[in-house]
């Protein structure tokens, strides 16, 4: 008779079903799937060779408790989590198709805790675009957006950094930040504004995909600088999904 498979040790930790992939070394995922935490062969039939895909490095920033991790996990796994340990730094990957382009999203979900503020410079240096998230029922988190934006600009040494302002928890009652306030702030920054619900998935894909489009436009601007003698063309696209 074949030998029975050994039972796992009693003290062996259970795998968290929504545990993120940890940076830095990550295998490439199959289409539309989060990369596995450990090895394994790549699934056949990829829409495009991994080497041919454009990779976009996205960073999610915002105050503690605004739903940064919930937004990211909803995008990656189509699942809402309302209880999880406070994030310090988690990395996720997903292959998607945006406007006909197969691309790989490398998403860094960051902490909003002040004691880790010094770590932000490091991950902001590598990020290409930033989701600046606040909760529509938390005025302080909205006020904190200015601080995050200024830190991003300082670290990137540029006023032209791809960003999207995200008002999360739009499914909840008790709104304290009106849509018009957020739209006005986004307009003053020259960036899009999108309202989301990590619980219902409303606006989640739109927020991340819009950021990818902002990164593409930023790259085009660097390749083809606008005529400095003409009027500026920075515009704000506010999307209330």
Curated annotation (Swiss-Prot):
Keywords: GTP-binding, Host cell membrane, Host membrane, Hydrolase, Lipoprotein, Membrane, Methylation, Nucleotide-binding, Oncogene, Palmitate, Prenylation. Its EC number is 3.6.5.2. It catalyses: GTP + H2O = GDP + phosphate + H(+). GO terms for cellular component: host cell plasma membrane; membrane. It is a lipid-anchor. Residues 239-241 form a propeptide. It is found in: Host cell membrane. A lipid is attached at residue 238 (S-farnesyl cysteine). Alternates between an inactive form bound to GDP and an active form bound to GTP. Activated by a guanine nucleotide-exchange factor (GEF) and inactivated by a GTPase-activating protein (GAP). GO terms for biological process: signal transduction. It is an enzyme of class 3 (hydrolase). Its main location: host cell. Disulfide bonds: none annotated. InterPro entries: P-loop_NTPase, Small_GTP-bd, Small_GTPase, Small_GTPase_Ras-type. One of its GO terms (molecular function) is GTP binding. Residues 1-41 are annotated as: Disordered. The modification Cysteine methyl ester is found at residue 238. A lipid is attached at residues 233, 236 (S-palmitoyl cysteine). This p21 transforming protein was generated by a transduction of rodent cellular H-ras-1 gene. Belongs to the small GTPase superfamily. Ras family. This is Transforming protein p29. The lineage of its organism: Viruses, Riboviria, Pararnavirae, Artverviricota, Revtraviricetes. The gene is H-RAS.
């Amino acid at each position: 008779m074949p030998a029975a498979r050994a039972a796992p040790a009693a003290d062996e930790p259970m795998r968290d079903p929504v545990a993120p992939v940890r940076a830095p070394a990550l295998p490439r995922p199959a289409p539309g799937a989060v990369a596995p935490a450990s090895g394994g062969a790549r699934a056949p039939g990829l829409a495009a060779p991994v080497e041919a895909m454009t990779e976009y490095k996205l960073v999610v920033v915002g105050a503690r408790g605004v739903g940064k991790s919930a937004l990211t996990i909803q995008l990656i796994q189509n699942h809402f989590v309302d209880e999880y340990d406070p994030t310090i730094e988690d990395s996720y990957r997903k292959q998607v198709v945006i406007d006909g382009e197969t691309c790989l999203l490398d998403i860094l979900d960051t902490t909003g805790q002040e004691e880790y503020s010094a770590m932000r410079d490091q991950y902001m240096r590598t990020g290409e675009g930033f989701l600046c998230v606040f909760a529509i029922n938390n005025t302080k988190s909205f006020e904190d957006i200015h601080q995050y934006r200024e830190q991003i600009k300082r670290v990137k040494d540029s006023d032209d950094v791809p960003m999207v302002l995200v008002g999360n928890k739009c499914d909840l009652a008790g709104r304290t930040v009106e849509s018009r306030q957020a739209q006005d702030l986004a307009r003053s920054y020259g960036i899009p504004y999108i309202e989301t619900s990590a619980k219902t998935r409303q606006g989640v894909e739109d927020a991340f995909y819009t950021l990818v489009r902002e990164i593409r436009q930023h790259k085009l601007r660097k390749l083809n600088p606008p005529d400095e003698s003409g009027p500026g063309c920075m515009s704000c696209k506010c999307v209330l999904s």
